[in-house]
């Protein structure tokens, strides 16, 4: 194919590419795509077992799902900004991604924890990140949660931990694979101030092969750098 400018590429595939000059952070890029590439697929999955038909979740539907998560985890934007929230869940991929991004839209800082971690390992990461709120899939991880609360109760210091069950798929995707711009939707209130580039956007953690897993902070600037990678570009 003949070489062309970026505008040529846009005209060929009908996409509107978000700017990657740092003017938009990762959450804003998803919002941009919801506005300018609203009907493009974000997820594609089989409609039913044994069926060859594919269904899709568009950028618009995914963005709105994230906004519904924000309403669920922080109603009315109450409480403090930038509090750390642990996500410890076994759930569908489309729900997990919405839970992750929705927590960020809510002005909070998620730490993504593997459910394979032991209770002492989770408690160690909670304390290292000063995290007092966990969103978990209680139906499948109830035993681990019980171990975490028991571990905290044996601690010398009183450590408060709020544990909430993750929102249901039907709550976050009420029009699964069929949401349109005219579907009822209430956007989450926007923050009065945008985050700084060196603010922590979320935490990952190390494997823990040589001890307890260590929290790894990912800043908004690092998130932008991920978007510039060809293999991960949005």
Give the ranges of each region predicted by the language model.
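Flexible, low-complexity linker/hinge segments
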Residues: 15-24, 169-200, 213
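Conserved AMP-binding A3 loop
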Residues: 56-60, 192-194, 201-228
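AMP-dependent adenylate-forming
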Residues: 6-8, 29-58, 75-76, 87, ...
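Conserved AMP-binding/adenylate-forming
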Residues: 52-59, 70-117
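Structural core segment of the AMP-binding/adenylate-forming
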Residues: 105-187
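AMP-binding/adenylate-forming domain of the ANL superfamily
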Residues: 16-44, 64, 69-71
């Amino acid at each position: 194919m003949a070489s062309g400018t970026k505008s040529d590429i846009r005209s060929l595939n009908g996409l509107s590419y978000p700017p990657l000059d740092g003017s938009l952070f990762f959450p804003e890029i998803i919002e941009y795509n919801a506005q300018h590439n609203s009907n493009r697929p974000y997820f594609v999955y089989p409609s039913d077992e044994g069926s060859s038909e594919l269904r899709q979740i568009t950028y618009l539907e995914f963005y709105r799902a994230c906004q519904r998560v924000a309403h669920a985890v922080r109603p009315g934007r109450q409480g403090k900004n930038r509090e750390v929230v642990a996500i410890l869940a076994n759930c569908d991929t489309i729900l997990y991604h919405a839970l992750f991004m929705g927590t960020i839209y809510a002005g909070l800082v998620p730490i993504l924890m593997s459910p394979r971690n032991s209770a002492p390992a989770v408690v160690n990461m909670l304390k290292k990140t000063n995290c007092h709120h966990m969103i978990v899939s209680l139906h499948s991880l109830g035993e681990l949660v019980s171990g975490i609360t028991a571990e905290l109760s044996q601690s010398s210091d009183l450590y408060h931990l709020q544990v909430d069950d993750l929102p249901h798929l039907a709550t976050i995707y009420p029009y699964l694979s069929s949401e349109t711009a005219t579907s009822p939707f209430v956007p989450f209130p926007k923050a009065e101030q945008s985050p700084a580039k060196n603010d922590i956007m979320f935490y990952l953690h190390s494997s823990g092969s040589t001890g307890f897993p260590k929290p790894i902070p990912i800043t908004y600037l690092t998130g932008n750098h991920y978007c510039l990678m060809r293999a991960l570009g949005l």
